[in-house]
Amino acid sequence: MSRTVFCVRLNKEADGLDFQLYPGELGKRIFDNISKEAWGQWQHKQTMLINEKKLNMMDPEHRKLLETEMEGFLFDGKDVVIDGYTPPSE
């Protein structure tokens, strides 16, 4: 049986993550307040950020940038802005 959380990103009850995917207090906050669906949305944006900005995950500054973007996306409702990216038309 899956657990449900009130997802602050989607503003609704939804299936929660199966386990804590991120370390520390932020990871606990994500586990308690973010749904699988919202986490999937973040993973998509994260991949775009890493690729388009050519981030190196071995660089502590790049990891901090990604963490800041993640917090903004998941908890503050900020969308990830990638210069020059045009979403495909539907």
UniProtKB/Swiss-Prot annotation:
One GO cellular component term: cytosol
GO process annotations (BP): cellular response to oxidative stress
Transmembrane segments: none
MF annotations from Gene Ontology: iron ion binding
Signal peptide start and end residues: none
Alphabetized InterPro entries for the sequence: Fe_traffick_prot_YggX, Fe_traffick_prot_YggX_sf
Pfam families: Iron_traffic (PF04362)
Gene3D superfamilies: Fe(II) trafficking protein YggX
Coiled coil: none
Keywords of this entry: Iron
Functional description taken from the UniProt entry: Could be a mediator in iron transactions between iron acquisition and iron-requiring processes, such as synthesis and/or repair of Fe-S clusters in biosynthetic enzymes.
HAMAP family assigned: Fe_traffic_YggX (MF_00686)
Name of the protein in question: Probable Fe(2+)-trafficking protein
